[in-house]
């Protein structure tokens, strides 16, 4: 089974242009690490011109800490297709950078242990949130000279129960199978403006990015404290438009079980820095959790 690119040439470039863009993001890449303390990372999934540098900070940190065997990648299901909790079952994903294999045994073990997820490829067919993470992973894996595998998971249902179930199931499955694993939670933060039908505050255009950041930081602080319930409480209180809290929550639970003690915000920006549009502002953050 092969999953071909759905958004190459749209969210990110193809061919030499992709390599050039990734190289520019990673021009400050340090030496490959061997500590392997990172348990989970958060990265955005907008077009690379908006959020690519922010996403690269997560993968730079992983490269300099040490690569895992498997990346379990969560992404919100924007298309509504397929199962509401869907793990890609087997085969490989194709990108302009080449192919990357799915750890089918790991995926099946997570489904078996969770009791709430399905093996389903349809949910992934056109979804961009996981696809845009892969060139970053392929780039650092090639730099390290290693082959890594992935377990892609799309979420159409995102709440504390789903996060707890999947975070624990990934921990149990990875322990049972002996998989060295990092969770990647693909998410953007606030989607502000008339374009998104979400205008909880108003201000001059130049003021809005800082206002968006202030609201996003209420959630980010909870993530940095490994506070799953607090994160969802803040989201509900603000009616916040963060699109991937379920994957972040699973990363929090998994990291707790892995005895992670520290989380760090590596980079934050908004789409306004590029678009200058006050009618559609999205927040982007790079976060890591580590032992």
UniProtKB/Swiss-Prot annotation:
Disulfide bonds: none annotated. Pfam families: Memo. InterPro entries: MEMO1_fam. CDD domains: MEMO_like. PANTHER family: PROTEIN MEMO1 (PTHR11060:SF0). Belongs to the MEMO1 family. This is MEMO1 family protein PH1626. It comes from Pyrococcus horikoshii (strain ATCC 700860 / DSM 12428 / JCM 9974 / NBRC 100139 / OT-3).
């Amino acid at each position: 089974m092969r999953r071909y690119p759905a958004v190459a040439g749209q969210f990110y470039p193809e061919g030499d242009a992709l390599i050039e863009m990734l190289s520019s993001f990673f021009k400050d890449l340090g030496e490959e690490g061997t500590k392997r303390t990172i348990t989970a990372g958060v990265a955005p999934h907008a077009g690379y011109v908006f959020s690519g540098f922010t996403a690269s900070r997560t993968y730079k940190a992983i490269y300099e800490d040490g690569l895992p065997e498997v990346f379990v990648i969560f992404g919100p299901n924007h298309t509504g297709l397929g199962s509401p909790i869907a793990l890609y079952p087997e085969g490989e994903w194709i990108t302009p950078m080449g192919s990357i294999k799915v750890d089918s045994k790991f995926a099946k073990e997570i489904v078996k242990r969770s009791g709430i997820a399905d093996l389903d490829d349809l949910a992934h067919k056109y979804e961009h949130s996981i696809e845009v993470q892969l060139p970053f992973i392929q780039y650092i894996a090639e730099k390290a000279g290693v082959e890594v595998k992935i377990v892609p998971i799309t979420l159409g249902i995102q709440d504390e129960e789903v996060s707890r179930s999947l975070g624990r199931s990934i921990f149990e499955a990875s322990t049972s199978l002996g998989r060295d694993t990092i969770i990647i939670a693909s998410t953007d933060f606030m989607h502000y403006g008339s374009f998104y039908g979400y205008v909880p505050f108003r201000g001059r255009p130049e003021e809005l990015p800082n206002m968006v950041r202030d609201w996003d930081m209420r959630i980010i602080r909870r993530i940095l404290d490994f506070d799953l319930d607090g994160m969802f409480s803040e989201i509900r209180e603000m009616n916040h438009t963060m699109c991937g809290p379920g994957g972040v929550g699973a990363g929090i639970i998994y990291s707790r079980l892995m005895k992670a003690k520290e989380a760090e915000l590596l980079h934050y920006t908004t789409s306004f820095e590029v678009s200058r549009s006050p009618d559609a502002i999205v927040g982007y953050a790079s976060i890591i959790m580590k032992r």
